[in-house]
From Swiss-Prot:
Residue ranges of the region described as Required for interaction with VCP: 168-258
Region ranges (Required for inhibition of CHRNA3 ubiquitination and translocation of CHRNA3 to the plasma membrane resulting in an increase in acetylcholine-gated nicotinic acetylcholine receptor currents): 1-165
Protein's recorded name: UBX domain-containing protein 2A
Source organism of this protein record: Rattus norvegicus
Keywords: Cell projection, Cytoplasm, Endoplasmic reticulum, Golgi apparatus, Nucleus, Ubl conjugation
Chief subcellular location: Golgi
Amino acid sequence: MKEVDNLDSIKEEWVCETGPPDNQPLNDNPQKDCEYFVDSLFEEAEKAGAKCLSPTEQKKQVDVNIKLWKNGFTVNDDFRSYSDGASQQFLNSIKKGELPSELQGVFDKDEVDVKVEDKKNEVCMSTKPVFQPFSGQGHRLGSATPRIVSKAKSIEVDNKSTLSAVSLNNLEPITRIQIWLANGERTVQRFNISHRVSHIKDFIEKYQGTQRSPPFALATALPFLRFLDETLTLEEADLQNAVIIQRLQKTAEPFRKL
């Protein structure tokens, strides 16, 4: 089986080109090079210790959706270039059957279900903030905390409507915020960029209603974990089209100096 030792051979941002090992020349067909790269990633993930799971063995977990396109890849609809250094480290971890470091600790003791879709024959035109449930074959990667990498087939989009609980000003810029709740549920809501982080927190409390969770804080998920100042606007906090995580506080008692 041919191996891809690293992702440094990806030269261009908008074309997936990863050549064969041993300094062999690139295929004249960029599409074939892209297919080779994506297929190798799945092969290396399985080689790292994956085992096949039947549908009855798979448990419901927190989902992280990764799609490998011809011109880049998306992580929960966040588009990334193959040529970016951080992207190469991210994909190298996936190839080794490991959870990328930027996702570690984000979901706090939850088992993360990383789903990888092969879309190497398609170009990602834009990100769509909709949840896409998984259907296909799963592979559990060997590690202390179970991880999932799965090659999905064609899937149906979950058309669950979001709660319209936020008053919008159509004369101001509007952005979509993806919100991962502590129970693993995901929702998408529109906000003006002049809204504050506290408005997102208010929306979550209304969304959860009678099933309101214990005290929580909000944090970003990508590219790294960062707790958010609730007094900042979405524009000031650079949260346009961002992914937000609900983090439960371990105690209802406020932080205090010892």
